[in-house]
């Protein structure tokens, strides 16, 4: 029996930093952050963009570790990099994006 390992991942991993805002970042819950990401995708790519599946892998204070499908990576990066939530002045800054989870190293 030959074991086969896939070296090409189907997923992309993204590290975001939540920046700015009048509300302290630690007080924003995960559902609100997910809503911000959906709004960013909707603003850039409409209703079809908001349907792009994104998984929250981990949250460490103001850093978010996300996973999306490799084919959607460019759309997700464009949408997140250009979105600013107006009343609160919250924006999502992309720090790192990779196709391998080992390259998405947590910040200390």
Curated annotation (Swiss-Prot):
Keywords: Hydrolase, Nucleus, tRNA processing. One of its GO terms (biological process) is tRNA processing. It catalyses: Endonucleolytic cleavage of RNA, removing 5'-extranucleotides from tRNA precursor. The keyword Cell inner membrane does not apply. Coiled coil: none annotated. It is found in: Nucleus. Part of ribonuclease P, a protein complex that generates mature tRNA molecules by cleaving their 5'-ends. This is Probable ribonucleases P protein subunit pop8. It comes from Schizosaccharomyces pombe (strain 972 / ATCC 24843) (Fission yeast).
